[in-house]
């Protein structure tokens, strides 16, 4: 069975939780390293989602301009 794709908002919330836990300084160095690694992975996923959305918006904007010019 395939894993359900996580939403942008859920990934962002997880990242915020990781940052908060690291900021409070109450976790061990080992846990901090694990959290940092997970945070980097989440950042990369979030960046990809944003870049994909940016690409889709660019395509829509380009199509909008073409439609306007052809009118």
From Swiss-Prot:
Pfam families: Exonuc_VII_S. Its main location: cytoplasm. GO terms for cellular component: cytosol; exodeoxyribonuclease VII complex. It catalyses: Exonucleolytic cleavage in either 5'- to 3'- or 3'- to 5'-direction to yield nucleoside 5'-phosphates. Its EC number is 3.1.11.6. InterPro entries: Exonuc_VII_S, Exonuc_VII_ssu_sf. Keywords: Cytoplasm, Exonuclease, Hydrolase, Nuclease. HAMAP family: Exonuc_7_S. Belongs to the XseB family. Heterooligomer composed of large and small subunits. This is Exodeoxyribonuclease 7 small subunit. It comes from Clostridium botulinum (strain Okra / Type B1). The lineage of its organism: Bacteria, Bacillati, Bacillota, Clostridia, Eubacteriales.
